[in-house]
Amino acid sequence: MGIVVRQSFLNLISIGIAFLIGAVNTLYLYPTFLGSKFQGLVIALLAISNLIQPFISFGTQHAVIRYYSKYTRKNDKDGLLTLSILIPLVIVLIFVPVFYAYYYDIRQYLFQSDQSLSKYAYVILFIAISTSFFEVFYSWLRVKLKSVFGNFLKELYPRLLIAFLLIFYS
């Protein structure tokens, strides 16, 4: 079996299992253990952080996929990875102090209609930074033709982690 067929099959299995676990999480575990208020809070935190994530990663995950095959020397490929990590890191190093300095103004402006989310602003920022770096490393795994592990981390691991946290939270 070829590498593409094998990885596609394994990715299909992991996505199917992740879908089932996600359905159990959404239909049973969230309402049972968190209630509708906290279920909405978790979904809102993830959605807002997913909106911020592209500004932090600045599209470097797409640049890795686009330009990796253009480089032939190992030093050039390593330089691409270094640059794709440094760009989000520089953005984070600029953005976090500005966010910290204007924290209360940002909270008032962004969360003027719903102040209950404002106390989770740091959580939103942390999730956005984490997902930005995850996307860069996931794209690196894809160009190295190791999509099964990256797909496992992207699809199955978060759902398993949420299920365990919800079960042990109760």
Q: Where do the model's predicted regions map?
A:
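Alpha-helical transmembrane segments and their helix-entry boundary regions
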Residues: Q7, N11, Q39, L80, ...
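Signature of the first transmembrane helix
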Residues: I3-H62, Y100, I127
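Short, proline-centered helix/strand-breaking motifs
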Residues: L27, A47, R66, E155-L160
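Alpha-helical transmembrane segments of multi-pass membrane proteins
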Residues: R6, L10, S14, I48-S49, ...
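Transmembrane-helix boundary and interhelical linker motifs in polytopic inner-membrane proteins
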Residues: G2, Y30, L34-S36, I52-L86, ...
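Hydrophobic transmembrane helix module of multi-pass membrane transport proteins
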Residues: I17, L86-S170
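Transmembrane alpha-helix boundary/hinge residues in polytopic small-molecule transporters
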Residues: V24, A63, F133-F137
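Interhelical loop/hinge segments that connect adjacent transmembrane helices in multipass membrane
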Residues: M1-V4, S116
